[in-house]
């Protein structure tokens, strides 16, 4: 599992430049002078209000093109969607409802295309639900009346993931993950977990942030992630 590259962001401010160091990492991982970017706002029910912020950020970082694909309204066939996804160097998934995202991706063929993109060495990035989607499972408040639930995801990273972990409500992940068969990764706003070149590392924005490992082999002991602890 060392072809593709993943940047999973727990949350944070995009418009104010807080997360620019993380976006710089995303673009650098593409290893292209002027990478092409595709944005998938699926988790936000394909609302595009915030897309201009992403387009501005990636443009400032030298990306040659930025395209938003609203899968639920674009009317693309599975083959057309696959071609769009594989044409990009960077695919960025926005936040919202993780269960909705996975349902749409599974039904549309996007899930298979994104797995193929990973194998082809593309950079897969995203925030909140758009970060959880790359893991085995995500922990999201997309259940009935905003309740938390686990959602099966793409399985490219081998843990349960929880974003926004500095928030007390999201820390319900700590007891909840004990019911799972795998360890948990929890990302605070401002923090991201990066997978590249066969190794993991945490990266944070200008205001800092921590990525936490809840290790099942150690009774879900909580440890800040550094460059060493996941690469042993």
Predicted features along the sequence, with ranges:
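Residues at the starts of beta-strands that form the adenosine-phosphate
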Residues: 5, 34-36, 65
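Short, flexible loop segments at the rims of nucleotide/cofactor-binding pockets, characterized by
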Residues: 13-17, 67-72, 101-104, 162-163
